[in-house]
């Protein structure tokens, strides 16, 4: 039985979510006396990180193959890291989850939205984030941030047009989700950081009262 709090951070490449999580990981190890574990997808545990490395190498794989590899990584990640943490009443904060698969593999790479959603249902077995925070960013700002990276991979969205398509897909999928909050990630990084930490802190405190 899940006891902890599962929080997912989503957003287009260049939204600042990964930088946010690196900073939060350094500054917050617990909230309201609840320990926090941080993770990412694909990855998060030994087997899942190995699958991540494989995904990064396979730039020309079929979109459904890629979606299945993400599912394999996610299954191991949930079993080995996320679910044990939640069962120990910890806060699990993850960089990306199933919504990323729906959008990137299902819609953008045309593996089929319903197909990708269905195969992920087998893996997640009904588990949903208690809170999803979408870092919504102006495509021009995201594209600039990506261009300034020292390294990039084939999963990164390079053009403003592609970023905008992904952004719109995120907004469409999450706009009516009562467990999702959309924040303006085009603001300066310190403002975004303070805002999101406050959202997470208040959510965890209110979650304990319910």
Curated annotation (Swiss-Prot):
Listed GO biological process terms: dTDP biosynthetic process; dTTP biosynthetic process; dUDP biosynthetic process
Keywords recorded for this protein, A-Z: ATP-binding, Kinase, Nucleotide biosynthesis, Nucleotide-binding, Transferase
A matching Pfam family: Thymidylate_kin
InterPro entries per record: P-loop_NTPase, Thymidylate_kin-like_dom, Thymidylate_kinase
GO MF annotation terms: ATP binding; dTMP kinase activity
Catalytic activity: dTMP + ATP = dTDP + ADP
SUPFAM superfamilies (alphabetical): P-loop containing nucleoside triphosphate hydrolases
EC number(s) given by UniProt: 2.7.4.9
Recorded GO CC terms: cytosol
Family: Belongs to the thymidylate kinase family.
The protein's name: Thymidylate kinase
């Amino acid at each position: 039985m899940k006891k902890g709090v599962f929080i997912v951070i989503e957003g287009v490449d260049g939204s600042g979510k990964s930088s946010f999580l690196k900073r939060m990981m350094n500054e917050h190890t617990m909230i309201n006396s609840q320990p926090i574990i941080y993770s990412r997808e694909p990855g998060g545990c030994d087997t899942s990180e190995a699958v991540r490395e494989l995904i990064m190498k396979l730039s020309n794989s079929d979109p459904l193959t890629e979606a299945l590899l993400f599912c394999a990584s996610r299954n191991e990640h949930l079993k080995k890291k996320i679910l044990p943490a939640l069962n120990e009443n910890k806060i699990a904060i993850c960089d990306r989850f199933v919504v990323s698969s729906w959008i990137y593999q299902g819609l953008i790479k045309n593996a089929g939205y319903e197909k990708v959603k269905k195969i992920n249902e087998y893996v997640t077995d009904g588990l949903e984030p208690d809170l999803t925070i979408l870092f919504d960013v102006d495509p021009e700002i995201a594209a600039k941030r990506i261009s300034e990276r020292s390294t990039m991979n084939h999963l990164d969205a390079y053009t403003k047009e592609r970023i905008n398509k992904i952004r719109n897909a995120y907004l469409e999928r999450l706009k009516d989700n009562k467990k999702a909050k959309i924040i303006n990630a085009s603001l300066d990084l310190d403002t975004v950081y303070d805002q999101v930490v406050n959202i997470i802190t208040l959510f965890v405190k209110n979650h304990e009262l319910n």
